[in-house]
Amino acid sequence: MTHIQPRPCQLTSPMPSGRYKPFVPHKLPDRTWPDKTLGDAPRWLSTDLRDGNQALVDPMTPARKMRMFELLVGMGYKEIEIGFPSASQTDFDFVRQVIESGIVPDDVTISVLTQAREDLIECTMQSLVGAHRATIHMYNAVAELFRRVVFNIDEKQCICLLYTSDAADDTPCV
């Protein structure tokens, strides 16, 4: 019977690891968050009502979206993204329907999505008039292909979009 020699856990390496100093952790006595643990459930935000580009051919009907909104509320969601009102009249109308129908419970925050363009921000703000509580998810796509193909803008124009968020300051209803 041949005796097999165990291999060491890690083979020696030709890399000059001795040249490098070991990691020295920073001592930050006022930093307490690493010792904290989660005691409550996280806040979940449903984005199920925003169809997105994948549904341009066959989007959800307003009636189906309304049933889904009621289902999400029934499941206990406290934050629900209900649409992209500046992207289509259908989404704008659905946002208005949700607000005007009064079906949003007091403890639920509705959310909408918009691109960071002044005209689209204004349209989005108008869709939310009368909402008890709402958030706006504003984005600015910075990927070169997305800028060029979808938005037809260059990098300089994309940077200029950063300064359009001031439009929200003029609408205190949201």
Provide a role label for each language-model segment.
Residues 163-170:
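Conserved small/polar residues in nucleotide/adenosyl-binding loops
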Residues 13-51:
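N-terminal amphipathic alpha-helix/helix-capping segment at the start of soluble metabolic enzymes
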Residues 98-103, 123-133:
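Acidic (Asp/Glu)-rich catalytic clusters
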Residues 67-80:
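Catalytic domains of carbohydrate-active enzymes, especially glycoside hydrolases
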Residues 99-111, 143-159:
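Glycine-rich tight-turn/loop motif centered on a GG-T
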Residues 44-47, 80-82, 106-114, 134-138:
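Hydrophobic faces of well-ordered beta-strands that scaffold small-molecule active sites
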Residues 78-100, 145-150:
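Glycine-rich, proline-tolerant flexible connector loops at the mouths of alpha/beta enzymes
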Residues 35-57, 137-151:
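N-terminal small/glycine-rich loop or linker at the start of catalytic domains
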